[in-house]
């Protein structure tokens, strides 16, 4: 279902501040620190400034922390915004990455597969050129249930924005003409055929607002950021690639995602952009009204 439908007609270790020429090996530098990451209790963490960058793996209010510490470590990276992407990911690349998801990784075993995943490019900076299908403020959709990567904080400024990036120009045109309500509990084509990109609360530009993002729905975009496998979602309930049902409750086309987003660009009006388009054909989200 996934392969046929999403094609369409067509003290945090700041690894991210490496110079562009060195970032290709960023993946293995991150992986070399996987075994030293631990899940911890939040203690007196009360605000986003207490969480990032002081808690590199986030934390939990549980007295017995069991979350995937290396996964959170990756989520909480702060890559420099000017890092040059090492490649562009399209449909074929995401299908290939799905095929490489290690058996047995489960929800909490990212560390065991860190080197293998780094070999697939996890941790390197990549670009995705597609269309913005949906925007989700997880503060609202989670009913302010905080994630461990953000120290289980429940404040409005402590939640990620989820973006659905798809590849079907016809569906994108429909969304642009008549943007449907995004309902993660009732996923449709826009959710099931898109890859997820996440803007994290401590790395996103102040002008990357939900309102400004929603004005770009259906438009051609280029998203730049860290490639990461969110192994929590590598299952039949979440990842449509794991499901054989033509229609089901799965809500994403891949467990691989861009997280965090470092750049978000929109194709200029009157242009038809591609991965080879010059910078002059794109405009940064923060420069748009």
Predicted segments with their positions:
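OB-fold and OB-like single-stranded nucleic-acid-recognition modules
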Residues: 23-289
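Sec/Tat signal peptide C-region and signal peptidase I cleavage site
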Residues: 18-22
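Bacterial N-terminal signal peptides
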Residues: 8-17
